[in-house]
Amino acid sequence: MKQFPFILLTCALAVPVLAQESKTNAATADVAASGQSFLASAAELTAPLALTNDYIYLTTAQAELQDGGKAVFNFSVTNAGNYQIETVVCAPDESSNSFFVNIDAPPVDPDMIWDIPLTSGFEKRVISWRGNGDSSTDQFTPKVFKLEVGAHTLVIVGREPGTLLKSLAILPAPPEKPATP
């Protein structure tokens, strides 16, 4: 199992490598009890998402769900349980801080919008879902995915230009804290 360290950089755009209709960059990776990390280049991309300088971004104006392209990460879980996804992203402003996200099915709008807290350059952020919340208060923070043993796909759809995804890690979710009486 390969582990990739997270790298902190500043946001920057460069010459894009545009996605083709379907571009496979990596095979399925196993997610063990300790988790699994992926660089953005491990995704299968469809336009208008693009890969440049080792990050994924939307090449067009704000996209509706059906127009945002896809970044698909294939992985396999060896231990059933609850998982969360930690990322390294750049979300510099309110117009550049969201993706659509789901596992094993296309995301649904607006429930599965991931509103990313603003960053100063590339920073770690855990995926959440808007659900019944709004752009400043997601309902599911963090979003915990219950996964069975076997093959899975993480689907990320572009939503706002300028939101950059550098890497991600699928990790076992920490145990839930008991409710305070």
Regions found by a protein language model. Give the residues of each.
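Positively charged n-region of N-terminal signal peptides that target proteins for export
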Residues: 1-4
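Bacterial N-terminal signal peptides
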Residues: 7-16
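Extracytoplasmic
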Residues: 20-181
